[in-house]
């Protein structure tokens, strides 16, 4: 080989090696870039679901092993937050990744203001009146047809929602559209009075007038929001009408009850103002959340509570062997719901996001997850389970008793209770400690009348909410000497009564038939007045329940003006002698000032 040929061969070899190296390097770069592209593609495949719910209103997990709920359908325990478990379930079910951005709000008005300020969420959980408002404002996305398809295995909501709840959502409308088109229920309940049965009689606790009962001066709490407070006031001032036989036995009782409890006439507003001002002078405090601790500590002996908070309060007190009861006022109770709705500004016609939102509702509506939520937060799920008995078995797990066990020897909390008017209750609490009813109110500041219910000016109120169709199959008879709405006339009930037991029918909720024998719980008789009665009120209580509708702009302004007079100091109540003393003090101060000026001028002249 010639030298020149040898050199050419080396160059050729070098070129080949360089070419191979370049190819390998390019392949590596290509592979790296492809990898980056794959990662980006995977990130793009993740559906972000922005959820906003009430504070402490979902199972956050972290249960201890001894908290495991053992049911025939299997053991239930919350290890992870429920919304984290949803992410894994969604991937396993739909083979798509979803990431839940979970945040909270404190009140319906806070949520509405957050939305008004531009915060964007895909799915939120307001109360019934705020759902009505958002529907009226055309802010919601209707559920897909697939969401209502009971043949789809994963549609746990529509297959398991209580017939009572389903009927309520399907028969109530806003502007001609049913609630169910836009809202899926989450939790529900009634309002009432948690009380200490050793100090407060059940008769006193079974009326809204307990808030002005001076037997419990500075030992009762009331809710610090205009809607709940107004409902109680209307019930109290209309006691004679609402409890009269002619009113209760009227064929259109349910419709008329809702109308009366939503009365915003000037006359009723004036009477409600007077009642709430008297309540303010009698109660320990207006509260939103502190009432539970005040009841458990014994600082107060009765408190206006939502049934879910009532259950929590009774549960916590019972851990310290301190037993509290729950009573629903005889005049009426507010039937409330919290439900999931999808927002247009969040979903934005994104089919994948809507599918994730509807799947989230279905996942938390699965009976075992409904039980997890009920155990963790104390409120009552709208889920009955359909063909799945998990929820009913959970009630039996909590409240059911063996018919062969005699409970007649249990302690009767009504014994040794001295409720005489001479009893001195002041020793149990220091009334001088932190009894500031108006600490959050600054009369010097401008008050935004839209804050409490935040309604826009272009809204039209819906027709009166009517649940008469929902409860028409529920019996009204209230047998004497029994817990309200629970019949104890037959021989088998007499035998149970001898053992301090009772049959507690729950058919209205689980099957839609109040007399369904498959849904009758044998329970400790006291439970009808405690946790069970709060979580699942009797049909008699449901008959006298009413839903509050949302207020239009004019009504909203009127009720807020009333509320300001309740919560702010009312100068009309200042005694005349106080005005006289104040005037004299002002005159004296002016005289001292003038005298000082005169003395100052005379000194300058000298």
Feature names for model-found ranges:
Residues 37-133, 137, 574:
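Early extracytoplasmic/lumenal segment of secretory-pathway proteins
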Residues 342-415, 475-541:
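Mature extracytoplasmic/periplasmic domains
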Residues 601-606:
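Cytoplasmic C-terminal tails of single-pass
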